[in-house]
From Swiss-Prot:
The modification Phosphoserine is found at residues 121, 140, 310, 333. Gene3D superfamilies: 3.40.47.10. PROSITE patterns: THIOLASE_1, THIOLASE_2, THIOLASE_3. It catalyses: an acyl-CoA + acetyl-CoA = a 3-oxoacyl-CoA + CoA; 2 acetyl-CoA = acetoacetyl-CoA + CoA; acetyl-CoA + H2O = acetate + CoA + H(+); propanoyl-CoA + H2O = propanoate + CoA + H(+). Transmembrane segments: none annotated. The modification Phosphothreonine is found at residues 119, 136. Pathway: Lipid metabolism; fatty acid beta-oxidation. The keyword Zinc does not apply. This is 3-ketoacyl-CoA thiolase, mitochondrial. The modification N6-acetyllysine is found at residues 25, 137, 143, 171, 191, 209, 234, 241, 269-270, 305, 312, 340, 375. One of its GO terms (cellular component) is mitochondrion. It comes from Pongo abelii. CoA binds at residues 224, 227, 251. Homotetramer. Interacts with BNIP3.
Amino acid sequence: MALLRGVFVVAAKRTPFGAYGGLLKDFTATDLSEFAAKAALSAGKVSPETVDSVIMGNVLQSSSDAIYLARHVGLRVGIPKETPALTINRLCGSGFQSIVNGCQEICVKEAEVVLCGGTESMSQAPYCVRTVRFGTKLGSDIKLEDSLWVSLTDQHVQLPIAMTAENLAVKHKISREECDKYALQSQQRWKAANDAGYFNDEMAPIEVKTKKGKQTMQVDEHARPQTTLEQLQKLPPVFKKDGTVTAGNASGIADGAGAVIIASEDAVKKHNFTPLARIVGYFVSGCDPSIMGIGPVPAISGALKKAGLSLKDMDLVEVNEAFAPQYLAVERSLDLDISKTNVNGGAIALGHPLGGSGSRITAHLVHELRRRGGKYAVGSACIGGGQGIAVIIQSTA
């Protein structure tokens, strides 16, 4: 076994994902985490008093209280004030990283039960004004900086993140048509799964205010199931003339959160938890920042090697859909079986709230693996700046 101790998922929940400026825009990332965490504690019958550690992933600290995020989540859901909390940032891998950190704490016996999670309110990313703190001269041309937009450029390689996907399209000879067809597949798979109720077990509904009054939100808002290939083909490339990346085949800017509670084998027995899955192993890898989207390839390969498993052993595979050409490059590099990869759609359909996607993918794999009667699954994400992360789980059903 890749881990030093048995570590089990005893609850896994996520909020519905809201569209940019949509139904969740007035909730902070902390609020969204609170919803997911409360749902996970309830679903797993986990008393807040039994939680030894809180670890939350978050990328854009977009609210005024964001620096306290993990701590406030723990306190809000009733976890004792003596229990420590940690907010982490491994960009798009932050939700996965919270689980990695939690496993590490359990393996070295610093904790027995850990509330992990990831969250993002991209809608609340502020505009900022730099250089004014210490005074400005008369006539200064003060610029507003969009903190969300500028963060989507890797300044080290001077490339918008989407251009790293364009680089992969060139390298792997991926066409615009292939990207649009894949985007359509993501939307269609999401619709089929949503219509069949496959997301129900992972979903933590939220009460939201609308023009019609308060309503319960329990469906991802960003998805566009009515999308057609013809509509996708009409969209202009955004970052490169004759490029492949469009608004229709890239992941959606979104708001949302997930929570995954993990526990040691000893804690499962002591508290009579119902284990949903075992954490088999994980791996984090670096890669060339100019093709950062290829990160899941070394990450998945490394995780499988550590666990003594192969892709053929996996019943489900999830690769976060940052961009269609990025996903397709990973698919080709690993020779993925499309019948068991991103089976219910991905971030192109339902959105990618940066810190929240790893938790969403993990929660989905936990429940989907059980629903299908499968054994192993691997979830992964590329990471801005040139990294990849992967986590392997085994169903206990």
